[in-house]
Amino acid sequence: PMTKVLNAADISKALNAFEAPGSFDHKKFFQLVGLKGKTHEQVKKVFNIL
C-alpha cells in the first residue's frame, strides 16, 4: 500500500488542498504528500503503486 512509503496524513492533506476543479499543482502536490524528500527508489515505488 501507498502508506508504506507515504504518511497517510500527508496524503489526505495533499488531496484536500486540491479539491477544487482546476486547482491541481503537481509540484505543490509532491511537496505536500512528502515525495520531495524521498529517494529515487521510493518515488519509483509510489508511481508503480499508482
Swiss-Prot record:
* Function according to Swiss-Prot or TrEMBL: Probably regulates the activity of the caudal neurosecretory system. Binds two calcium ions.
What is the name attached to this protein's record? Parvalbumin
Q: Where is the EF-hand domain?
A: 38-50
Q: What's a single GO MF annotation on this record?
A: calcium ion binding
Does the keyword Zinc feature in the UniProt annotation? no
Family that this chain belongs to: Belongs to the parvalbumin family.
Keywords, in A-Z order: Calcium, Metal-binding, Muscle protein, Repeat
Q: Which PANTHER family match?
A: PARVALBUMIN ALPHA
Going by the entry's taxonomy, the superkingdom of the source organism is recorded as Eukaryota
- GO cellular component terms listed in the entry, alphabetical order: cytoplasm
- InterPro entries assigned: Parvalbumin
